[in-house]
Amino acid sequence: MHFAKLGAIGLLGSIICAYAASAASKVIIDNDGLTDLQVLFALQAKQQILGVTAIYGDYTLDDSLFLASDVLSTGNLTYCIPSFAGAAQPLLRTNNTFQIWQELYGSYVWQGYWQPEYETANTNNESYIYNTQISAAQFIIDMVKANPNEITIVAAGPMTNLAIALSIWPDLAKNTKSLVIMGGYVDSQIAQVTGGDFLNDMYSDFNLFMEPEAAQTAITADWPELIIAGNITSQVYPSQSLYNGIIARAGGMANIESDSGLSYAKQFVGNGTLPSGSFPFWDEVASAIAAWPEIVNSSYDAYVSVDTAYDSPFYGSLRMVPADLVPKKGVRTAKASMITGINVAMFYQKIYDSLTAEYSSYCMNGTIITPSNITISNTTNTTNTTGFY
């Protein structure tokens, strides 16, 4: 069941949001399963989140909308950060063609909402809030037109919403400040072959292969800046020492359990013990790069495209060429900054800061309440992280 925002509430949310961050840099988060830290990183960096656009992918569109609403409502952020429904399925690819391709070229460990045993994220059939007045693609267009050359889009799911928006308004990309994507793995076959199903999944380019044609359309558009957070997003993990640091900064587990202002911390640490098989900070790393560009400590430039040949074993994979070998005809490419390393100590510190702050007043007056200024060192990995590239 969906509860749409009334027009007056949507307008009020826009006014409040403008008040809360009128002078901030602007960001739109496009994702198939929003996480807490994606929102909190942007707020901590004093970015203005214009909205969240949901899409199919890891989850169905309905589940993606539910997760976005859940993330925002936890911090009382629903009425100043609107969310919008995007594509419910790819434009071209179907589950049938997806399965046939796997029979021809090999299976993916993770298939998102096409997983045969897929289970809804909204297990209790809860109601949730999102804006039904316009689509995600139209929202992106409207915001870029209203804020030319000011908006960073963080795309951490399949890129169908962006492809639709670009088909409606081809000048969208060149009027945007930058596009940061989560995806675009390169040179990862050794890790996939030798690391078992877990590592194979970690380096499967899900956001590209769910709809390669949309990914190619979006990635090779005329963005002033294209930042690809690929391999690096599969190399930064949560740790027990990270959990311990969050708990210490929040004043202990008892305080986390009793203080409603620490709801994000509570959701993150659970019972205080790191679960086995924890996944890396995929989308969070991309959002951190968008929030704090200085977190990047190594990268290189390449001209990129996405393989859109269905009869190719690399269908849906990112391809790269150097500047002097860019195709002059045929395949369209775009210059991208390929991120290969971040300051992991800084990343963990941003997690501490984000999860132990209190956001319930943000929509009313832009206030984020933080605990006393404590710096917790993470002993698991405070070095810079680089990976396969």
Curated annotation (Swiss-Prot):
The keyword Transferase does not apply. InterPro entries: Inosine/uridine_hydrolase_dom, IUNH, Ribo_hydro-like. Residues 1-23 form the signal peptide. One of its GO terms (molecular function) is purine nucleosidase activity. Pfam families: IU_nuc_hydro. GO terms for cellular component: cytosol; endoplasmic reticulum; endoplasmic reticulum lumen. Keywords: Endoplasmic reticulum, Glycosidase, Hydrolase, Signal. The keyword Endoplasmic reticulum applies. It is found in: Endoplasmic reticulum lumen. GO terms for biological process: purine nucleoside catabolic process. Belongs to the IUNH family. PANTHER family: INOSINE-URIDINE PREFERRING NUCLEOSIDE HYDROLASE, INOSINE_URIDINE-PREFERRING NUCLEOSIDE HYDROLASE DOMAIN-CONTAINING PROTEIN. This is Uncharacterized protein C800.11.
